[in-house]
C-alpha cells in the first residue's frame, strides 16, 4: 500500500470534464480516464502508479494545498 497518498476532489462545472491519470516512471503514460458531467464529483488519489492528474474542462479542484478552478473549453 502506498502510504503517502494525497486525495484530490474534482467537481465538474460543465458537462464533459475529462480527468486523466498519468503514470510514474521513465515513460509517462495515460492509465485511467473518467468523463464527468456537470455536478458530478470524483475523489482521486495519488498512488504508487499515479503521479499526476490532468483535468480538461471547467471544474473545481480541491487539494490539501487549496482550491483552484480550471478553465472551460473554448
UniProtKB/Swiss-Prot annotation:
<comment type="subunit">
    <text>Oligomer of 11 identical subunits arranged in doughnut-like structure.</text>
</comment>
<dbReference type="GO" id="GO:0006355">
    <property type="term" value="P:regulation of DNA-templated transcription"/>
</dbReference>
<dbReference type="GO" id="GO:0042802">
    <property type="term" value="F:identical protein binding"/>
</dbReference>
<dbReference type="GO" id="GO:0006353">
    <property type="term" value="P:DNA-templated transcription termination"/>
</dbReference>
<dbReference type="InterPro" id="IPR023558">
    <property type="entry name" value="Trp_RNA-bd_attenuator_dom"/>
</dbReference>
<keyword id="KW-0805">Transcription regulation</keyword>
<dbReference type="InterPro" id="IPR000824">
    <property type="entry name" value="MtrB"/>
</dbReference>
<protein>
    <recommendedName>
        <fullName>Transcription attenuation protein MtrB</fullName>
    </recommendedName>
</protein>
<dbReference type="GO" id="GO:0003723">
    <property type="term" value="F:RNA binding"/>
</dbReference>
<keyword id="KW-0804">Transcription</keyword>
<comment type="function">
    <text>Required for transcription attenuation control in the Trp operon. This trans-acting factor seems to recognize a 10 bases nucleotide sequence in the Trp leader transcript causing transcription termination. Binds the leader RNA only in presence of L-tryptophan.</text>
</comment>
<dbReference type="Pfam" id="PF02081">
    <property type="entry name" value="TrpBP"/>
</dbReference>
<comment type="similarity">
    <text>Belongs to the MtrB family.</text>
</comment>
<keyword id="KW-0694">RNA-binding</keyword>
<dbReference type="InterPro" id="IPR016031">
    <property type="entry name" value="Trp_RNA-bd_attenuator-like_dom"/>
</dbReference>
